[in-house]
Amino acid sequence: MAEISAKAVKDLRDKTGVGMMECKKALQETDGDMEKAVEFLRKRGAAMAAKRADREAKEGVIAVKTTEDSRNGVIVEVNCETDFVARGEDFTKFAEAISEIALANFPENKEALLALSMGDDYQGQTVEQAIEAMTGKIGEKIEISKVGVITSNDSVVTAYVHPGAKLATLVEIGPASTDEVEDLSKDVAMQIAAAAPLVVDRSAVPQEKLAQEAEIYKQQALREGKPEKFVEKIVTGRIEKYYQDVVLLEQAFIKDSSKTVSDVVKETSKRLNKTIEIRCFLRYQLGEK
């Protein structure tokens, strides 16, 4: 067996991020061949990932990024098994690296993201291979549960991350420049995090969902003993309240509850002398489907 120097162990650790003892073992198993040792550690990570595939990964972080021109943004949920690992530097840096790859490529789904290269910092591994290697390094199942992308030509895309990185949002407002809607976009991104709307405007609420809610409210009113002739009016009122809860534009504005989000958007449009709108948003909360 080849003599394994401390420098070789350190070099392998610098290259892979794996612990010193594991690096020494890999070099011993491969007679000191650095490239074979790297491959040994990759296979070890893949084996560990397969072994832990049935484990639940419910902890993690939401990583969100926008391009320098604020025209595009990505949001990614990266999961692990424990909060201890989720708060560790290795995991958080890894999640950030994945979000940077997503921002550079705008993958249309999780599968497309997993197939992308992580670049030279990860020896050209794909995201999927890098996840396997990181699983081997930290000893926990790691997975990407979802990824979202917003791209635009004339809108501002703004991100908000709640402290702890368990909740984050992206919102697109336009047509506008960053200077025109910077304050509004930040406020709306925070609004989405705090108030958890489901859609931008009421036209986007699925009809089947409305019918379901209406039936629930009808049955509630009847159980409460309301006269049947008043039930329809009661249901209509409760549906309006439902809109105020789940429709972003109809929610009370978190910084001034005397206004709705729609009011604030209209005020900004008037100030800019052009019509702007909230075009779409994404809200990721750890563990939510």
Swiss-Prot record:
InterPro entries (UniProt xref): EF-Ts_dimer_sf (IPR036402), Transl_elong_EFTs/EF1B (IPR001816), Transl_elong_EFTs/EF1B_dimer (IPR014039), Transl_elong_Ts_CS (IPR018101), UBA-like_sf (IPR009060)
Region of interest (Involved in Mg(2+) ion dislocation from EF-Tu), residue spans: 82-85
Matches recorded under Gene3D superfamilies: 1.10.286.20, DNA helicase RuvA subunit, C-terminal domain, Elongation factor Ts, dimerisation domain
Localization terms from the record: Cytoplasm
Keywords of this entry: Cytoplasm, Elongation factor, Protein biosynthesis
Superkingdom as given in the UniProt entry: Bacteria
Main location: cytoplasm
Entry GO terms, CC: cytoplasm
GO molecular function term, any single one: translation elongation factor activity
Record-linked PANTHER family: ELONGATION FACTOR TS (PTHR11741), ELONGATION FACTOR TS, MITOCHONDRIAL (PTHR11741:SF0)
Family membership: Belongs to the EF-Ts family.
Job of this protein: Associates with the EF-Tu.GDP complex and induces the exchange of GDP to GTP. It remains bound to the aminoacyl-tRNA.EF-Tu.GTP complex up to the GTP hydrolysis stage on the ribosome.
Annotated protein name in UniProt: Elongation factor Ts
